[in-house]
Amino acid sequence: MAAATADDEGSAATILKQAIAGDRSLVEAAEAISQQTLLRLACEVRQVGDRQPRFTATSIARVDVAPGCRLRFVLDGSPEDAYVTSEDYFKRCCGQSSYRGFAVAVLTANEDHVHSLAVPPLVLLHRFSLFNPRDLLDFELACLLMYLENCPRSHATPSTFAKVLAWLGVAGRRTSPFERVRCLFLRSCHWVLNTLMFMVYVKPFDDEFVLPHWYMARYLLANNPPPVLSALFCATPTSSSFRLPGPPPRSDCVAYNPAGIMGSCWASEEVRAPLVYWWLSETPKRQTSSLFYQFC
């Protein structure tokens, strides 16, 4: 087998090839590939009866870490200094009959193409899962991921990054390796946080957690690039074989922040329509916890 280059030796495909060739143990390969997996497109889901659902990625306008490493939020539409504690927001959500939890999509790092995904609509349908947090920390992680994905440039400051990293450190120390879903959310937050830092020209805390296509995009899309370069990071027409199995539903029920740096793929109809189609389908919604085998 040809040796992997420095640029691709950490990719999931390369790791799998090494395992097949016997250059890595299966356990090591599985662990390495799992590090390339993250959750994206986090959004809250609300629905009253059989009415049109509402998918909201903008519920949290700002995140802050208060003394004692306690998370607090400014909710969308509230004054900038009107903070609510994460505990209060958790109770508020759980008390709403319309609240369904969070929708999230599973991707690998190489599938995130900045303004698009390397996952066609028909496949993306099967990447979504429903997350119903029962613990405050799990709820906080989902909220933080959703906020980081929609964080505008004006909020992306070194002080915010430092506070978020400190909070993630505390959350990580409270998390057992056997709490696989929580570990996945933690890893996803680190991927998005470090990539966001890179995109606003702040040195990331960990360069290994900068999404590869975003790394290229910052350099290639600067200074009015030619269309051929811009097209590398934008959605292209999907083959009819990989389109949704039925008419695409209306996607105006998906709320996202157009100014959110890490959520630019939300603008693509090929991302929003599969989310709505998945939710409206009659098939049971897969729970995020079912992504992992339980050994007990």
UniProtKB/Swiss-Prot annotation:
It comes from the Viruses. InterPro entries: Herpes_UL7. Keywords: Host cytoplasm, Host Golgi apparatus, Virion, Virion tegument. GO terms for cellular component: host cell Golgi apparatus; viral tegument. Its main location: virion. It is found in: Virion; Virion tegument; Host cytoplasm; Host Golgi apparatus. Belongs to the herpesviridae cytoplasmic envelopment protein 1 family. Plays a critical role in cytoplasmic virus egress. Participates in the final step of tegumentation and envelope acquisition within the host cytoplasm. Interacts with UL51; this interaction allows incorporation of UL7 within the virion. This is Cytoplasmic envelopment protein 1. It comes from Human herpesvirus 1 (strain 17). The lineage of its organism: Viruses, Duplodnaviria, Heunggongvirae, Peploviricota, Herviviricetes.
